[in-house]
């Protein structure tokens, strides 16, 4: 639950008003009641309309995780404390250069979320705004 609180405070609340921003959490089948409790707690803090949960069998979660080609592994509950930025085209976003390689952000670390994920979310949202401006300019011509 602490990880969801960290995400909510450091990332979600700052970006929830952007049309294209949402959280999608993939969770194992059978955790629906636990998720309801998490959402109930978050609902006291924020509008949870952009917190979306997808429930799937454990093997499908593992298969999806494998398609991302991540260095880390899922734990025995088919989860991880890491969160990832996936863009509209379903590309994994992060920091790719060797000096500061980062494919995910540790949700149990408020400083990781605040110092790094915040900046990386700003970058992708700026890209979306720029693309929208370009498209609108082309329509006016």
Functional labels for PLM-detected ranges:
Residues 11-15, 65-68, 72, 121, ...:
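Sec/Tat-exported extracytoplasmic proteins
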């Amino acid at each position: 639950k602490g990880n969801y609180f960290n995400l909510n405070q450091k990332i979600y609340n700052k970006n929830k008003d952007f049309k294209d921003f949402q959280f999608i959490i993939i969770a194992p089948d059978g955790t629906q009641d636990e998720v309801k409790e998490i959402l109930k707690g978050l609902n006291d803090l924020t509008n949870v309309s952009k917190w979306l949960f997808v429930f799937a069998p454990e093997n499908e979660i593992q298969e999806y995780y494998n398609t991302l080609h991540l260095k880390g592994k899922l734990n025995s509950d088919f989860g991880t404390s890491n969160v990832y930025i996936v863009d509209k085209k379903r590309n994994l976003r992060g920091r790719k250069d060797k000096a500061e390689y980062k494919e995910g952000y540790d949700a149990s670390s408020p400083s990781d979320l605040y110092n790094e994920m915040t900046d990386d979310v700003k970058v992708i949202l700026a890209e979306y705004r720029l693309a929208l401006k370009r498209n609108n300019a082309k329509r006016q011509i």
